[in-house]
UniProtKB/Swiss-Prot annotation:
This protein binds to 23S rRNA in the presence of protein L20. HAMAP family: Ribosomal_bL21. PANTHER family: 50S RIBOSOMAL PROTEIN L21, LARGE RIBOSOMAL SUBUNIT PROTEIN BL21M. It holds the Pfam family Ribosomal_L21p. This is Large ribosomal subunit protein bL21. It comes from Deinococcus deserti (strain DSM 17065 / CIP 109153 / LMG 22923 / VCD115). Belongs to the bacterial ribosomal protein bL21 family. InterPro entries: bL21-like, bL21-like_sf, Ribosomal_bL21. The keyword Ribosomal protein applies. It comes from the Bacteria.
Length: 100
């Protein structure tokens, strides 16, 4: 059985045992989370009101920072060049189960 969850403005396809990186969430490593699925698939597909009683149980594994991404700006003819960098914070969560 798998589920589609939404967190941090993004959607993820998860099933029991998966470890995924999501946008930064509050909580320490080892904290439990209950996420509401948008869609549950498996033997039959369920969505909308049919998944209102389903819960995806997850556990916070770690907090970290992603790889550095460089942003460059350039304008020809005027010697305008800029380079900045960014590292996105993330939270790794492990899916413990899909219950409903």
């Amino acid at each position: 059985m798998f589920a589609i969850i939404q967190t941090g403005g993004k959607q993820y396809r998860v099933q029991e045992g998966d470890v995924i990186r999501v946008e930064n969430l509050k909580g320490e490593a080892g904290d439990k989370l209950d996420l509401t699925p948008l869609f549950v698939g498996g033997d039959q597909a369920l969505f909308g009101d049919a998944v209102s009683n389903f819960v995806v149980n997850a556990e916070v594994v770690e907090h970290g920072r992603g790889p550095k991404i460089y942003i460059r700006k350039y304008k020809s003819g005027v010697q305008y060049r800029r380079r900045t960098g960014h590292r996105q914070d993330y939270t790794a969560i492990k899916i413990l189960g899909i219950k409903g």
